[in-house]
């Protein structure tokens, strides 16, 4: 477990340096993929993971091109980039144990925000050298931590798969900010047969560090309109 925690901390600090806003999370998707590609999970990318026609608030073609060029410069391989360069970012990972049991789903968001990160001595990422390398973009809402926790969970399930039953689906979701990305995965059918669904957020309520709060209510609803 200590190894998983240490790996999660390292991944979180790496992801924190490369924040990408919704539907442009190409480097992020690649970094997550590299962490989980050698597990027993079946991985789905691009149009296999999300329905592009169900996405809301997509970036412009110019923004997507800029993001793909940045990802290419980072070192994202062509095969991976070709699957996600059109805004079909994120990963869906599935483990079917082959043993009868419930289908459990987990969702971890991966996008950053259009915020310039502080360069102050009171800001730990700046002081310890892992602040954002992308001007005007920042992980200001903890999604770098969420993605890292999701990867750690996936690795834990994989390491203990012989003791499990049922099916596990883990969604590394693009474009949570603005509530734009979830519909693409929903319409793809990933949740159709899920019996239990879990998602989480770090620091959502003011509790002592290390405390888990099982429920939040009263402020998570939303309604969207398409204005033509």
Spans of model-derived segments:
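Short low-complexity stretches enriched in small and charged residues
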Residues: 58-66, 152-154, 181-187
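Histidine/acidic-residue-rich, glycine-tolerant segments that coordinate divalent metal ions
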Residues: 57, 91, 113, 127, ...
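Acidic/His- and Gly-rich active-site-bordering loop/insert found
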Residues: 2-139, 163-164
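Predominant activation on well-ordered alpha-helical scaffold segments within soluble catalytic domains
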Residues: 29, 33, 151-155, 183, ...
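Flexible, small-residue-rich helix->loop connector segments that border functional cores
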Residues: 152-165
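A generic secondary-structure micro-motif detector
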Residues: 1, 22, 171-175
